[in-house]
Structure formats: structure tokens, C-alpha cells
Design a protein with these regions (language model features):
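N-terminal glycine-rich phosphate-binding loop and ensuing alpha1 helix
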Residues: 71-131
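Short phosphate-binding loop-to-helix
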Residues: 139-174
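Short aromatic-hydrophobic micro-motifs that form the base-stacking/packing surface
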Residues: 175-179
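RNase III-family endoribonuclease catalytic core
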Residues: 182, 190, 284-285, 292-404
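Conserved core of the sugar-phosphate nucleotidyltransferase
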Residues: 185-272
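Short, conserved loop-to-beta-strand elements that form functional interface hotspots
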Residues: 389-398, 402-435
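C-terminal edge-of-domain segments
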Residues: 434-449
């Protein structure tokens, strides 16, 4: 057995337009005295996920003085999103908002959720670290966008965004949906439910009931706290613009969210059912959890005939045998199955499309090099291989002596540990074409994140 090529070299090489709903929210309901407005839960389906698509050729405004609502009362009741992306990410240890997460950054995922929830415009409150990402999104957005500098605290960032909205002269009844970009797993349905609640009652705060047993520690004593009626606040938090602006103008102290200031100002917040998935990215453990939620899977299969006069290459290993696999490239069925599994997980075209057998450039191509190109394409989408499991189906030759080398080759090119690659071999007990020694096949499943 010998290595056909250097996997390290290949590892180095691997280094529909969206349709958005019209701006509209539910009509305003009858309002009583602020103190009499009841707090309630408006249930909503949270199964939706932000859709993907191009944003090119759409209008964008990055000047905060531009009329985000067009300055017309004709859009009375429209909503504008505020996307907060000015945090320091000190506990995360890296820039959690711009780093790819399952192919898209947290800013992009939250931005898409606001758009999917039906906002008519978006104001980004940014830091110098996130400004460039916000500018890219704004440049291709299907709604007007503005970018403001974030403050030293979340409260200051929101205040800056509200001031930018005020300068656009929003119409009566306008709603603002304030969202932490770090809550990038929010579903558009939650955004829409919060906006609709704000249109009816003045506010719509995403929240989830406390499900765990709660204790308060005082000194060395633990006292149980009844969890009935307890909720964990999330975002988005949507409000009538006039009311939340009033609440911020009257703020006389710090608050960790907008609903707190809203309540201090004498308003009664309305809760909207959030989701356990809508957690904030704060620690590395939160990031790992989000990656698990966003893991994608693909499968691959390939088969080639055994013929005389060809080398038998499997998993980048040249295996001594009297026959080899027939194909336009080196016919490495194992790597071909792995490549198609990875491409499927990333929703990319298969190897027949990327490396057609009608192209002379791929005649006799080294499949290790092709795998490197596949990994590079996946990384260009902001993803990376996570796990690979493959099975070789062949009557002969014996594969066991070569399995470890195959795993090492695949791991090296994919940039993962050999412990994240499984390769097995099986026979068909003399049945079918594999069993009669006419061909060798392989199947694989892969995950990317």
C-alpha cells in the first residue's frame, strides 16, 4: 500500500431572489388607560427559519437623515427594525456577530429574520468591528436601511437608533422592533407576532415561561421561588415608536432591556410567546449549541466497474490489485461518494456538474485534489466539514489494511480530526455486481456546519 498523493497539499488547496411581504401590521385595537392594559401571551408558530436569497438590485439607504418611511402617513402602522450589533463579545473571545455560523453570520441571520417578519426598514447600531458587515447588508437590502454608531451600553445604542428614526419623521402609529443581533436563531414568525402585538396593544415582547425549578440564594440558605408567572425576556421587543421614545426620554437609570424602561414609564408590556431556540450568543457554549442546531447533512453514492489495466485508488490510497476502477478521473469511488455527501450538505451542485466527464481537464484527475476543491467551495459558503462516515462495498480486495490511511487522507484534506472520519468496508456475500467482482461502490454521509 502506498499513499497516492500528499493529503497536506490538497488540504492547503481547500484552505431566487427573496420576496418580502409588504409593510403591514395588524390594525390597532381599542386602547384603555395605560395602567389597565393587560399583560398577556399571544401564541405564535415558531417553526419558521429565515429564508436565503439574493439581495442585489434592491434599494438601500445608509444616510440616517433619509426618510425611512417616505415621510407619508400613507404607511401608517408600518414597522422599522432596530438591529443591535455593537456589543464587545468579551465573554465569547471572538467576534460572534460577523463570524460565519452555519454559512451566515449572526448579523445576517438576525437581519433576515427582521426582513421576514415584515419590517419596512432597518437601523443598524454598530461598532467599528461590525460596521462593514452592516454596510454590506444595507447595500443589498430590499428595504431602506440606516447605520448609526452604537453606544457604550445597549441602552445607549437603542437611544441612538431611536433618534435616527425620529429624524425620519415616522408616521403616527409606527412600530419599532428592537432586536439583539446575537439572538440570531429567532424565527421571522416571532418578529411578525411582536410587531402585530405592538400594533394592537402598544407593545409585543418575546418571552418564554421559566420551566426550571428556581431558587434564590441568600447567604447560605436556598429559598424556592414559585415559577408560575415567571418569564425570561428575549428579543425582538416591539413598541409603538412614540411610546418607546417617550420611555427612553424619561429613563432615569440603567436597564438591561427595553421592556423594563417601557414599564418604568407607566406602560404595560404585552408578552408574545418566544422560543427556546431564540437564545443569545454569549459564551462559547452558546456558540456550540447554535452550531448543533445548524448542522446540515448530505449523502453520496458512487460506483465504478473493475477493469484490467487500471490502478485501484480508494480514499487516495493506491491499493495493489489485479484490476482497477474505470472512470474519466482516477475513479476513486470512496472520495466521489464523500464529495457528493459534502456538496449535498452544503446544497451545492454534485461532482458530475462541477467536474464533468466531458471536460478533458478532468481526465485522470486526482480525486484528492477534487476533494480539496469541494472543501474550498464549502468554506466559501461560510461552512466547514464536521463529520464523515463512509462504507466501501466490494467483494475483493481486503480493505482492512488500508482503512486507516483512507481516513487520514480524508481528514487531512477536510481539515478535521481523523476521529471525525469513519470508513468501513463490507461485501455482498457474492450477490449482485459488487459480489461478483464486477464493480466497487461506496456510500457516504457527511455533516457540515
Amino acid at each position: 500500500m502506498r499513499q497516492r498523493t500528499d493529503p497536506a497539499a490538497h488540504a492547503a488547496a481547500a484552505g431566487a431572489r427573496r420576496e418580502w411581504p409588504d409593510c403591514a401590521i395588524a390594525g390597532s385595537g381599542e386602547r384603555g388607560a395605560l395602567a389597565e392594559r393587560p399583560t398577556h401571551i399571544a401564541a405564535t408558530d415558531t417553526d419558521g427559519t429565515p429564508s436565503e436569497g439574493a439581495r442585489a438590485d434592491n434599494r438601500a439607504v445608509t444616510d440616517t437623515e433619509s426618510g425611512m418611511f417616505g415621510g407619508s402617513g400613507e404607511q401608517d402602522g408600518c414597522a422599522i427594525g432596530v438591529l443591535l450589533c455593537a456589543g464587545s463579545a468579551a465573554r465569547m473571545g471572538f467576534d460572534k456577530l460577523t463570524r460565519p455560523l452555519g454559512g451566515r453570520s449572526a448579523i445576517e441571520r438576525s437581519f433576515d429574520a427582521l426582513l421576514g417578519g415584515g419590517v419596512a426598514g432597518i437601523v443598524f447600531a454598530v461598532s467599528e468591528t461590525t460596521r462593514q458587515a452592516a454596510e454590506r447588508l444595507a447595500a443589498g437590502a430590499p428595504v431602506p436601511c440606516a447605520i448609526v454608531q452604537g453606544g457604550a451600553t445597549r441602552q445607549e445604542s437603542v437611544k441612538n437608533a431611536l433618534e435616527a428614526i425620529r429624524r425620519t419623521n415616522p408616521p403616527d402609529g409606527a412600530v419599532v422592533a428592537i432586536h439583539d443581533a446575537a439572538r440570531c436563531m429567532v424565527a421571522p414568525e416571532i418578529v411578525r407576532a411582536c410587531i402585530e402585538s405592538a400594533g394592537r396593544t402598544g407593545s409585543g415582547i418575546a418571552a418564554v415561561p421559566v420551566a426550571d425549578t428556581v431558587f434564590r440564594q441568600e447567604g447560605g440558605a436556598l429559598t424556592p421561588v414559585p415559577r408560575e408567572g415567571l418569564f425570561r425576556m428575549q428579543t425582538p421587543q416591539a413598541f409603538r415608536f412614540s411610546e418607546i421614545r417617550d420611555a427612553y426620554a424619561r429613563a432615569d437609570g440603567a436597564a438591561t432591556d427595553d421592556a423594563t424602561l417601557y414599564r418604568r414609564a407607566g406602560y404595560s408590556p404585552t408578552l408574545v410567546m418566544g422560543s427556546a431556540d431564540n437564545e443569545k450568543l454569549t459564551t462559547p457554549a452558546d456558540w456550540a449549541r447554535a452550531e448543533r442546531m445548524l448542522t446540515r447533512y448530505g449523502t453520496g453514492f458512487d460506483t465504478h466497474r473493475l477493469v484490467e489495466g487500471r490502478k485501484l485508488i480508494l480514499g487516495g490510497v493506491d491499493i495493489p490489485f489485479e484490476r482497477g476502477l474505470l472512470g474519466h478521473s482516477d475513479a476513486d469511488v470512496l472520495l466521489h461518494a464523500v464529495m457528493d455527501a459534502l456538496l449535498g450538505a452544503a446544497a451545492l451542485p454534485d461532482i458530475g456538474h462541477l467536474f464533468p466527464d466531458s471536460d478533458p481537464a478532468y481526465a485522470g484527475a486526482d480525486s484528492m485534489a477534487l476533494l480539496g476543491q469541494v472543501v474550498q467551495r464549502i468554506r466559501e459558503k461560510g461552512m466547514r466539514p464536521l463529520h464523515i462516515d463512509a462504507t466501501i462495498i466490494a467483494q475483493r480486495p481486503k480493505m482492512a489494511p488500508h482503512i486507516d490511511a483512507m481516513r487520514g487522507n480524508i481528514a487531512a484534506v477536510c481539515g478535521i480530526s481523523v476521529h471525525q472520519v469513519g470508513v468501513k468496508a463490507t461485501t455482498t456475500e457474492g450477490m449482485n455486481d459488487e459480489g461478483r467482482g464486477l464493480c466497487i461502490s461506496a456510500q457516504a454521509i457527511a455533516s457540515v456546519v
